[in-house]
UniProtKB/Swiss-Prot annotation:
Protein name: Protein Daple
InterPro entries for the chain: CH_dom (IPR001715), CH_dom_sf (IPR036872), HOOK_N (IPR043936)
Compositional bias (Low complexity): 1623-1643, 1667-1704, 1927-1945
UniProt source species: Danio rerio (Zebrafish)
Bias (Basic and acidic residues): 1442-1460, 1890-1904, 1974-1988
Transmembrane residue ranges: none
Length: 2023
């Protein structure tokens, strides 16, 4: 019970509520004594103290402080506390306690119960609720916060229970509220209903309880009288004094009543006095309140006055300050003006920075390009690393092979040596045998038998010799092999040495690389740091810019506000002037103040602006510095790039590092293997150690195994040492490996870092751009601010002027007024302040007195408190000491209790042990007795048996027995003594007992071991005796004596042992076990004696056996009976002993109990005696008290009478006092009212006086104000005039400023534009510089060419004479043909006229061209001043005569076809050049079936049948110009004439036609159809064949299509997109980029030109082709075998027709040769009419796929040409050889002539298409010469610089557009006749990529392939007859005749037929040809669409001033040049 109470108390005292209560003060006497603390709480005094602290109101009742465990007082205290709590909740907190109040009875009666503690918790909870909601709650909460977190949390939950839980405490504040919202009403009503239900339940329960209590009372009352009667006498006697005492009580109660009445009176009197005091105090308070209100009013008035005075003062001061500030502001303004100039400077600086930024951006783009290159190199590095790894692996394999070879070599050397030795031996043997043979030959005289023997020997020797010879041969071969192997080995060793050297060098390089890497690391780190700094600076700049912007915005807004204020002020001034004078003056004053404020604000703002300007300047400086830093960084960037490039160059060195790394990896692998091996060894060692441990355990049993283990250990030790070493080595190697890995990772990280740096550079550049943008924005804002500043300055000036005027007036007006007012106010204020100060002084004195009195009281209290504190501290000390003692006593008590329980337990155990001990002792005694009996028996038997012999031994035995008995007795005595001592010292030896027990167990074990030994020894002795007895005979007495002696010795030993054991047992107090041991030993001894006796008896008495047997049997029977009896007696004895032991223990316990009871009895008797004495003394005291009581009752009665009298007197006095008090109060009230009235009157009087004074002052002031107002009005007018003038000035200035700003902006824009142009021109200048350098190089080459050209001239002139004669013949033939054709139809009359017009125009063109040629030939002469006339041109001109005859008859249908050809309309330049995909125009009229053409966009896919069908649709976007030009044909014609007309007569044309009509067979073209080259990017070619004429060998038109390259590769808009790499490649360089049409001015003339190609350019091909096919007798073939696509097919093309053009009306050199071939069979027709001079221009750009290395013939025009046999088709004679032309057979394929167009060239721009061959002079392709050879060569000079050979080699697929008729698929017209303006279709793959930098058409370099066959090209441009359109009808008719749907283009003007040198090129394989179209399609760019259209007009303008150029003579110096003038 005690424990539970203490636990409850400790739990309660540790609860959070009690911990909180302790914060109010100390509980109990000591903080450690929980009981006293708890009792303090229960008594209620401390709780009351807490409640008074919470609610210090005087209504609270007092509490009994000294409770002294009195229940009633405790109940009273607790009730007062609860009442106080309830009142506080209801009155102060407006809350109702709903929870059950604490049960005071339970707490008071049984405070230490759990229930009372729960009730106390409830009370503390209510107090906590009061404390948290009281006025001092902050202080209490602060105290709570100082507690632990857990207690705080618990207290918070408790607070929530009280405050928030409506079930515990109900809030009544809602009753005061008028209307409760519906949201609060619902929960409130619910809680109210719950509480109501609870109250009703409690009411019902209490009603039931009352009923039960009344029933019990009634029952007890009914039972009481009967109980009293039946009570025994002593109870009655005890009840009688109660009835007697009731009278005395009544008297006592009466006295108390009187006393209480007196007290009541006193209290009433006090109450009345207090009420009176209260009323007085209330009156005093009311009076004081009224005084305070008055004082407050006065105070407010005074404050208002003081404020006004201060305001005036402040105004005066501010005005003075402002007047002083004006000068300062003016100076500041001047300063600002100066700074404006700086702002302009900064503007310029910003612009400069922008420019710098642009340059930085350009550098950034350059750097990015370099970066891309560097990245590419990095990618290559990875590939190189892979290769490096592969090479390493190969090297490793080689090394392995080398090692194996070395081993093999060594073995072979050994074998070689052995073989040499054996060979020497065999040689010696053979020599010896030879010698023997010689000897035998000499000794022929020996007998036959001997001869036969020698013969046999010779035979055997010869056979052996043969064998040896064979072996020798084998050995020699092996020796030879070994020698070779040794040589190989030596080479391998040398190679390995070289590799080692390389490795060393690589390692050095690696080291160098690493050092460089470290350097670059540092540089990269520096760069990163710089980058980070730049980023930080950028961020700072951004922040500063943002702040500047914000500040500027703020300033702008402030300035605007100021401006508004100023404008408002001006307007208010105007309004004020019109108002009354008084109002005006006040307004002026206020406005002045405002103006002064604004001026001060503007001054502050100006200062701020200055500061900001400084900041801006600083920022600009910092920006400059950053810009400089950026420039430095940009300078560093290229350096870093260089470093990076060096590193990339030295990437090879990294390979070495990787090789080393691999070697290390291999070593690492080997080391890992070693490591594994070592690990295995370590595992084995560990296993060995485990085994060792096992062996060490076994070592105790097996010493031999231990030795072996030691040996094994010794063997393992060195291995362990070796293991440690190996581990260290392995660790070192691992470290090295890790270091290598780190280095590799560092290298990688550096690579990544460099990439990151590059990215960061990019990001920095972007950030720079952004910063520059922000700078620009800031500069614009600055400009805006400057403008606003200027405006503000102007406004400021105006305002200052106004202010100056106003100041003078205001100062004059205000000074007087303010001084007067100020003086008056100061006076009144001083008076009021004086009064106030007097009152304050009085108040302070009173307060001082009160505080002094309070101080004295406090001092007294302090002293008393200190005394109490000292006393309390002493008491506390005492209480603490007492508590400490108490705790110590409690601890001792607990310890004693524990000891007592332990002692009880030990006693019980000891009792049990005693009983057991006694039993054992009795048993041992019994055993001893038995032993003694047995010993006696044994002794007797022995005496009987051995009386004579063993007398001495008997004595010894007896002595032994006596000794044993004595020892036993002694031990028994000792044991008894010890038992007694143990019983006496039970308590002391409890601890020793346990120790002894543990020791006993060990001793027992030892004894048991001893017993076993003794038994074994005894058994051993018995066995030994028995064996001895069997073996020995009876008479052997000596032996028996010896045995006896041994037995006695053993006994003696046993005795000694027993003595030792006894001693040990004595020492350990274990006598019982010793007895047992002794007993067992004795038994053993007896047994041994018996055995000995029996043996002796056996030996001695064998004779008496029979007698003794009978006796023995009887004795045995007796002994058995006796043994049974002894066993039964023993059992009985043991049971008796047990009983006796139990009885003894019981006896001892009873005796101890009786002794304790006796002691208790004695103590009780002593207590009884003391109680009796106390009872007697109490009886005496009782008697004395009864006597005193009687006396007191008498005194009390007397006092009652006195009290009654005094009460009546007192009541009378009180009534009188009340009346006097009432009269006094009435008088005081009257007095107060009178005083108030008097005060009011005084105030009224003062007010009247003040009013009079103020009125007088107002009159005076009004007069003054009227005067002032008049002055102010005049000033105001003047100010207005000034304002108007200033505003006018301001507007003018503003306008000027705006105009200036506009001008500056325009200037800036123009400056920027000019700078941009400058940059562009600079770039252009750089490009031109590069071109110039290239041209210089080419010039040197071309100078050499010029020399060669001069040599060629003579030859050419001779040739021209020869050709002119042929031309005459041809012209005659042509004339005859024309006559025939013109006779056939009347329609050709019109055509004849058109031809004449065309010829006239061509004549004009020719004349112009001749002039140009003459000009151009100046350049070919080394002395350019001398101009040579071209003799050939004049000679040719003589042959051409105009034929003006009318048309003649046409002999046959083919001529009709020829006649229809010229009517094909000419396509013109499209109107929209840049719109290639514009919609096609309406289709032309239907075409005749024989002349219908396929649609251009479907040329690739159309079948042969489609070729025969009319195709009216137009598919090329370039046809847009057709409709436009149909109406305006005449205009285009005039244009043609104006630009380049020719002077060709009709004669030549007709002769040509005649000659062609005489040609019997179809002529073949020697170049493949439409094998387009790069020289015609902007042109289209159109070839046409007649339906009736097909080439030989082709059955149908479909065959033509299939066999021609055109059909094979398809023709989009371009026709066949073939490649002519051999014959026209050089002409690409010349004519594509340098043609005379593409002059510098061509760009300007782009729009002004309508057409640049004659109308028959497109059509004339068909004419000429058809004529040629009719007239040619033999198939035209080249002397060279050109491997065309048809050549490789079974059906060869012997009669493929060449394309014709309008230019073919003039007889070209080719045609002349064809005619001569036709006339003279021995000669050969040239392969092309254009290919005479192409040989010179040919450049071999390929890696010679011509297997035989054939070289081309250079001269096809010389009369004597060496023929090439058919079998040597692939070979051609070397350049310079004179080759005779031979007639080729018809079956050999002759490639059709390849035509090409003249390319367009932009002014001053070099086409990139010409730059695709290497600059070493290997020119990538051939091109045709345009109009004149001289112009072409001049342009060649320009384009044939070092760059002109670059791109050409790689562009096989630049395309010409070929236009076809249905039946003429295998034909192609020349370049000159192709449609220049036609742009390709969108779908066409044959486009050329445009290089936008050079405005030319180029192809990628790497797309050049040796795919297309190298056909011979015609590079001469036929003169194009200009077609004149008579009208739209004639053009339409022509279109219908031609049936072509070809695109329109700008016609060429002034194109001239040229002859170029011809070079035959060896054929390529067919598969190359077949691969070509795919490559072409892939390579061609769609950009050609635009380029084609843009280049249309480029070809029209001529270039009269171009330098002469000639092809590079390096490749082909023996090429002969021929020139054929324009005819």
């Amino acid at each position: 019970m005690d424990i539970t109470v203490s636990e409850l108390m400790s739990n309660f005292m540790d609860s959070p509520l009690v911990v909180w209560v302790k914060t109010f003060g100390p509980l109990g006497f000591s903080s450690e004594d929980k009981l006293s603390m708890f009792m303090d709480l229960v008594d209620g005094v401390f709780l009351h103290k807490i409640m008074t602290h919470i609610d210090p109101s005087p209504m609270n009742q007092r509490v009994n402080k000294q409770v002294n465990n009195d229940v009633n007082l405790r109940i009273q205290n607790l009730n007062t506390v609860i009442r106080h709590i309830k009142n506080y909740y209801q009155e102060h907190l407006q809350q109702l306690i709903v929870m059950n109040l604490p049960n005071v009875l339970a707490i008071a009666k049984d405070p230490l119960s759990g229930k009372s503690m729960e009730e106390m918790k409830r009370m503390l909870l209510l107090i906590l609720g009061c404390a948290v909601q009281c006025d001092r709650k902050e202080e209490i909460i602060e105290k709570i916060k100082l507690l632990d977190i857990e207690t705080q949390a618990a207290i918070v939950t408790h607070i929530q229970e009280v405050t928030h839980n409506q079930e515990n405490v109900l809030d009544l504040q809602w009753m005061e509220v008028a209307e409760i919202p519906a949201e609060q009403l619902d929960p409130l009503s619910r809680t109210m209903a719950f509480h109501l239900r609870k109250l009703i339940d409690e009411r019902d329960e209490s009603a039931e309880l009352v009923i039960e209590l009344t029933q019990e009372r009634d029952y007890l009352q009914s039972q009481q009288p009967s109980g009293l009667l039946g009570f025994p006498s002593p109870e009655r006697t005890s009840l009688s004094p109660i009835t007697l005492l009731s009278k005395e009580d009544r008297q006592h109660l009466a006295v108390e009543l009187a006393d209480t009445k007196a007290k009541l009176r006193r209290s009433r009197q006090e109450l009345e006095e207090k009420t009176e005091q209260l009323i007085d105090a209330k009156n005093e308070i009311e009076r004081l309140d009224s005084d305070i209100q008055k004082l407050k009013q006065e105070n407010t008035q005074l404050l208002a006055e003081a404020r006004s005075v201060r305001a005036y003062r402040d105004e005066v001061d501010s005005l003075r300050e402002r007047a002083g500030k004006v000068d300062r502001l003016e100076t500041e303004l001047s300063r600002f003006k100066e700074k404006l100039n700086d702002v302009h400077f900064y503007k310029t600086r910003i612009e400069e920075l922008r420019e710098d930024n642009l340059t930085l951006l350009e550098t950034k783009s350059m750097l990015e390009e370099q970066l891309t290159g560097a990245r590419g190199r990095c990618d290559k590095l990875h590939e190189l690393e892979k290769e490096n790894l592969q090479l390493r692996s190969k090297l490793h394999d080689i090394e392995i092979d080398r090692d194996s070879d070395k081993k093999r070599l060594e073995e072979l050397l050994e074998e070689n040596m052995l073989l040499e030795i054996s060979q020497k031996q065999s040689m010696n043997e053979s020599a010896h045998l030879g010698w023997e043979l010689e000897q035998l030959a000499k000794n022929n005289e020996v007998n036959e038998a001997r001869k036969s023997f020698v013969f046999e020997l010779n035979e055997s020797a010869s056979s052996r010799l043969l064998k040896l010879e064979k072996e020798n041969q084998c050995l020699q071969s092996t020796i030879q092999e070994l020698r070779e192997a040794s040589i190989n080995m030596e080479e391998g060793q040398l190679h390995s040495l070289e590799l080692e050297k390389e490795n060393q060098s690589l390692s050095k390089k690696l080291e160098r690389l690493q050092s460089q890497l470290d350097q670059e690391k540092q540089t990269t780190q520096d760069m990163e740091n710089l980058g980070e700094e730049l980023i930080k600076e950028k961020q700072r700049m951004e922040k500063t810019l943002e702040t500047i912007q914000a500040e500027k915005d703020r300033q702008i807004s402030e300035l605007e506000q100021e401006k508004e204020h100023l404008t408002q002020a001006v307007s208010s001034l105007r309004k004020r002037a019109q108002a009354n004078s008084e109002a005006r003056v006040r307004e002026v004053e206020t406005e002045n103040r405002i103006l002064h404020q604004t001026i001060s604000e503007t001054g502050g703002k100006l200062a701020r602006l200055e500061a900001e300007k400084r900041q801006v300047t600083k920022e600009l400086e910092s920006l400059r510095e950053r810009g400089e830093r950026c420039e430095e960084l940009e300078r560093e960037v290229p350096r870093l790039e260089r470093v990076r490039e060096q590193l990339q160059r030295e990437a090879a060195a990294l390979k070495i590092g990787s090789e080393r790394a691999e070697a290390l990896e291999r070593e690492n692998a080997t080391l890992e293997q070693d490591n594994r091996r070592l690990k295995k060894l370590a595992d084995t060692a560990q296993n060995a150690t485990l085994r060792l441990a096992v062996l060490e355990k076994d070592h105790q049993q097996l010493e031999e195994e231990n030795l072996e283990q030691r040996r094994a250990l010794e063997t393992l030790r060195p291995a362990a040492a070796r293991l440690a070493q190996l581990q260290q080595e392995h660790a070192e190697l691992e470290r090295e490996h890790e270091e290598m890995c780190r280095t590799m990772e560092e290298l990688r990280s550096q690579a990544k870092r460099s990439e990151r740096l590059e990215k960061s550079c990019g990001s920095l550049s972007l950030e720079n751009q952004r910063l520059q943008q922000t700078l620009e924005n800031s500069s614009t804002k600055m400009q805006g601010l400057e403008s606003e500043l200027r405006q503000n300055e102007a406004e400021m000036k105006d305002l200052q002027r106004e202010l100056e005027g106003l100041r003078q007036k205001v100062t004059w007006a205000e000074t007087l007024e303010k001084e007067n007012r100020g003086m008056e106010q100061e006076l009144s204020q001083l008076e009021k302040e004086k009064k106030q100060l007097e009152k304050e002084a009085r108040r302070f004195r009173q307060q001082l007195e009160v505080k002094e009195a309070a101080l004295e009281e406090n001092c007294l209290r302090l002293a008393s408190m200190e005394k109490e504190g000292t006393a309390l501290s002493k008491e506390l000390g005492r209480v603490k000491e007492a508590a400490g003692r108490l705790k110590e006593l409690e601890r001792e008590n607990k310890d004693l209790q524990k000891q007592a329980t332990m002692d009880k337990k030990t006693l019980a155990t000891l009792r049990e042990e005693l009983v057991n001990e006694k039993l054992r002792v009795q048993q041992q005694c019994n055993e001893l007795e038995k032993l003694s009996h047995e010993l006696e028996k044994i002794g007797l038997n022995r005496e009987k048996l051995l009386q004579e012999e063993h007398s001495c031994e008997d004595n010894k035995y007896k002595i032994l027995e006596t000794k044993i008995e004595s020892a036993l007795k002694k031990t028994l005595e000792l044991r008894e003594e010890k038992i007694q001592s143990l019983e006496s010292r039970l308590e002391e030896s409890s601890s020793l007992n346990q120790q002894l027990r543990t020791e006993l167990t060990t001793v027992k074990k030892n004894l048991e071991a001893l017993k076993q030994r003794h038994e074994e020894e005894a058994a051993h002795s018995e066995i030994s005796q028995q064996t001895l007895g069997q073996t020995r005979s009876l008479p052997d007495k000596e032996k028996w004596e010896m045995e006896q002696r041994e037995a006695t010795a053993e006994l003696l030993k046993l005795k000694d042992r027993l003595i030792d054991v006894e001693k040990n047992v004595r020492q350990r107090h274990v006598s019982i076990d010793i007895h047992r041991v002794i007993f067992s030993i004795v038994i053993c001894f007896c047994d041994s004696l018996q055995n000995a006796a029996l043996q002796t008896e056996k030996y001695l008495l064998k004779d008496q056996l029979k007698q003794i047997d009978s006796q023995n049997a009887q004795l045995n029977a007796q002994t058995l009976a006796l043994q049974k009896q002894a066993a039964s007696l023993q059992e009985h004895n043991t049971s008796l002993h047990k009983e006796t032991a139990k009885l003894q223990v019981e006896n001892s316990t009873l005796s101890s109990q009786s002794s304790s009871l006796m002691a208790q009895y004695g103590a009780l008797q002593a207590q009884l005696q003391t109680l009796e004495s106390e009872a007697e003394s109490l009886q005496k005291q009782r008697e004395e008290a009864s006597a005193a009581r009687d006396r007191v009752t008498q005194d009390h009665e007397r006092l009652l009478g006195v009290h009654e009298r005094q009460a009546s007197e007192y009541e009378q006095l009180i009534a009188q006092h009340a009346a006097l008090k009432a009269s006094q109060r009435a008088l005081e009230q009257e007095n107060r009212t009178l005083e108030n009235k008097y005060m009011v009157l005084l105030k009224q009087k003062d007010a009247m006086e003040a009013l009079e004074e103020s009125l007088q002052r107002d009159r005076e002031s009004l007069g003054e104000e009227i005067r002032k107002n008049t002055l102010i009005l005049g000033e105001n007018r003047s100010l207005r005039e000034e304002v108007d003038r200033v505003s006018h000035m301001h507007t003018q200035l503003r306008q000027e400023y705006d105009s200036l700003q506009l001008q500056t902006k325009e200037l800036k824009t123009s400056l920027n534009e000019s700078q941009l142009e400058l940059n562009r021109w600079q770039a252009r200048y750089d490009q031109l510089k590069e071109q110039h350098q290239g041209l210089d190089i080419s010039m040197t080459k071309l100078d050499n060419h010029c020399e060669l050209l001069t040599r060629l001239k003579g030859n050419l002139e001779e040739e021209n004479h020869h050709l002119l004669s042929q031309i005459q013949m041809l012209s005659q033939q042509n004339q005859t043909l024309l006559e025939r054709t013109m006779e056939s139809k009347e329609l050709y009359h019109e055509e004849q006229k058109q031809y004449i017009d065309k010829l006239n125009s061509l004549r004009r063109q020719k004349e112009k061209l001749e002039e140009k040629i003459m000009d151009q030939y100046k350049f070919y002469d080394p002395t350019p001043k001398k101009s040579r006339q071209w003799v050939g041109a004049k000679a040719i001109a003589k042959f051409i005569k105009p034929k003006k005859e009318s048309s003649r008859e046409r002999p046959d249908a083919p001529r009709e076809r020829i006649r229809s050809a010229p009517d094909i309309p000419l396509p013109e330049i499209p109107t929209c050049i840049d719109c290639p995909e514009s919609a096609p125009p309406p289709p032309p009229p239907p075409l005749p079936p024989r002349q219908s053409r396929p649609s251009l966009d479907s040329m690739n896919s159309q079948s042969v049948e489609e070729n025969h069908v009319q195709s009216p649709t137009l598919s090329s976007p370039a046809l847009n110009g057709r409709v436009l030009n149909e109406s305006g044909g005449s205009r285009s014609r005039d244009g043609y004439r104006s630009i380049g007309g020719g002077s060709e007569s009709m004669n030549g044309y007709e002769e040509l036609l005649r000659w062609r009509s005489r040609e019997p067979g179809g002529a073949t073209c020697s170049t493949p159809l439409s094998r387009n080259s790069h020289n015609a990017p902007g042109f289209t070619s159109s070839s046409s064949l007649r339906p009736g004429r097909r080439p030989k060998g082709l059955v149908s038109e479909e065959d033509l299509r299939h066999h021609s390259p055109d059909a094979g590769f398809g023709s989009g808009v371009h026709g066949n997109t073939g490649h002519r790499p051999s014959s026209a490649e050089f002409s690409r360089n010349t004519s594509s980029s340098n043609s005379p049409v593409s002059s510098k001015g061509s760009l300007d003339c782009l729009q002004g030109r309508s057409a640049s190609l004659s109308s028959d350019d497109v059509v004339g091909l068909a004419h000429e082709g058809s004529r040629l096919s009719q007239s040619s007798l033999l198939p035209r073939s080249s002397t060279l075998p050109c491997d065309s696509p048809s050549a490789s097919r079974p059906s060869q093309r012997p009669a493929s027709r060449r394309p014709s053009s309008p230019g073919s009306e003039m007889v070209t050199l080719e045609e002349f040769l064809q005619e001569s071939n036709a006339l003279s069979p021995p000669t050969v027709q040239t392969g092309s009419r254009e290919d005479l001079m192409t040989d010179y221009f040919t450049r071999s750009t390929r890696p010679v796929p011509l297997r035989d290395g054939a070289k081309t013939p250079t001269n096809y025009v010389t009369p004597t040409v060496k023929t090439t046999p058919p079998e040597l088709d692939a070979r051609t004679p070397k350049p310079g050889h004179s080759v005779k032309p031979s007639v080729r057979l018809t079956d050999t394929s002759t490639p059709p002539s390849h035509s090409q167009t003249l390319p367009n060239r932009g002014a001053g721009l070099r086409p990139s298409a010409l730059q695709q061959s290497s600059p070493r002079g290997s020119v990538g392709g051939s091109a045709s010469l345009s109009r004149t050879f001289s112009l072409a060569s001049a342009d060649l000079l320009r384009s044939n610089g070092p760059d002109s050979y670059r791109t050409e080699a790689a562009s096989p697929n630049q395309n010409d557009v070929v236009m076809r008729r249905p039946g003429a698929v295998a034909r192609e017209r020349p370049m000159s006749a192709r449609v220049t303006g036609s742009s390709p279709l969108p779908g066409d793959p044959g486009h050329i990529s445009v290089d936008p930098r050079r405005l030319s058409l180029a192809q990628p370099r790497d797309e050049f392939s040796l795919v297309s066959p190298p056909p011979l090209h015609s590079s001469s441009m036929s003169l194009q007859a200009e077609r004149e359109y008579v009208g739209s009808g004639s053009s339409r008719a022509g279109a219908a005749r031609s049936g072509s749907a070809q695109p329109r283009g700008a016609p060429h003007r002034g194109e001239v037929a040229m002859v170029t040198p011809v070079r035959a090129v060896p054929a390529l394989r067919l598969n190359d040809l077949e691969e070509e179209p795919q490559e072409q399609r892939e390579a061609e760019s769609p950009l050609l669409k635009k380029a084609d259209t843009t280049n249309l007009s480029y070809a029209s303008k001529e270039q009269p001033t171009s330098k002469p150029a000639s092809p590079d003579p390096n490749n082909d110096p023996q090429t002969v040049w021929y020139e054929y003038g324009c005819v």
